[in-house]
């Protein structure tokens, strides 16, 4: 009899705990988030490639593009402006210094993959980079043809040119090296341009050292490290977000939610959004997570339907050409 009573008491305690956790993380009891989702156009408008074939940090992705249906190249003025016109609320660009002290938009460590040049980007002068054809190395058939050759001559822009092309829309600057001096160089360009980078909401990400440095310079702007900081926040929240306590790793940080891993996010969406807003953190929804691969953005329009209607954070997008207009319908 006593044993039976103890079992009932234990069961009652479990039920109360489960009920408490349910209410604590109940999204329907949280306030409705204000605002709409914001699209981050990764690389602006660019040539999508076969992600399964082109893997690895140093893989030449230009060798694996899908048959091209446009002549717009990543990290160019046309790419940035078109991405904004298609609905990109923020356009992601890659920055790299030149041999003669300038700073340009270019993704790769060397120019060998995409262009008709050779060598590291940092070992070339601005005039040498401007002379290159950035469409030279693109092929969709394993090198049998190069349909974009001659289409990208002189299109590598300086950061100053990019700022002038996007005076009213925020940019997300990606540091491509671990050198914190590049943060100083970029910040000096922003200051000299007269751009109101704080009001516009420009943001920065990349390796830890340049991110830490830009935080010291642009103290009111969003800066983050995707590999360590965002990963820690996301993992920590999944582990003990059920308590209602937001991990310290998320404070003023970034929580990344793969489209296929929304289910372990406690209080998703409304309660989670309120918690992150309470500690100054941003949320980024990205494309499907695949084990052993880095996160990519959304490229399938149908994935938009998997995001809760009340979500008001950021969505990382690969194919802004398709995703942008679809979200605005």
Name each model-derived stretch.
Residues 2-329:
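Phosphate-group recognition and catalysis centered on beta-loop-alpha active-site segments
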């Amino acid at each position: 009899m006593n044993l039976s009573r103890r079992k009932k008491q234990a069961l009652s305690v479990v039920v109360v705990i489960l009920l408490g956790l349910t209410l604590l993380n109940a999204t329907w009891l949280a306030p409705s988030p204000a605002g709409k989702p914001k699209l981050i156009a990764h690389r602006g408008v660019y040539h999508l490639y076969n992600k399964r074939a082109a893997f690895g940090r140093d893989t030449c992705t230009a060798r694996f593009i899908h048959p091209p249906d446009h002549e717009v190249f990543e990290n160019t003025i046309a790419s940035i402006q078109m991405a904004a016109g298609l609905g990109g609320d923020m356009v992601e660009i890659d920055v790299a210094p030149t041999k003669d002290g300038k700073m340009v938009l270019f993704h790769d460590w060397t120019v060998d993959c995409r262009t008709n040049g050779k060598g590291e980007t940092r070992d070339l002068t601005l005039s040498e980079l401007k002379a290159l054809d950035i469409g030279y190395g693109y092929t969709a058939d394993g090198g049998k043809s190069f349909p974009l050759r001659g289409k990208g001559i002189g299109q590598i822009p300086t950061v100053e040119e990019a700022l002038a092309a996007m005076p009213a829309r925020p940019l997300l600057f990606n540091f491509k090296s671990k050198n914190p001096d590049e943060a100083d160089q970029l910040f000096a360009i922003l200051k000299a341009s007269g751009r109101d980078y704080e009001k516009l909401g420009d943001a920065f990400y990349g390796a830890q050292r340049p991110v830490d440095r830009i935080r010291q310079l642009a103290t009111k702007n969003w800066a983050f490290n995707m590999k360590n900081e965002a990963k820690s926040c996301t993992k920590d929240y999944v582990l003990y977000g059920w308590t209602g306590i937001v991990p310290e790793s998320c404070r003023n940080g970034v929580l990344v939610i793969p489209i296929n891993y929304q289910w372990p996010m406690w209080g998703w969406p409304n309660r989670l959004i309120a918690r992150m807003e309470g500690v100054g953190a941003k949320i980024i929804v990205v494309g499907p997570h695949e084990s052993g691969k880095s996160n990519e953005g959304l490229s399938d329009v149908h994935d938009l339907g998997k995001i809760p209607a009340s979500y008001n954070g950021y969505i990382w997008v690969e194919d802004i050409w398709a995703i942008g207009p679809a979200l605005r319908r």
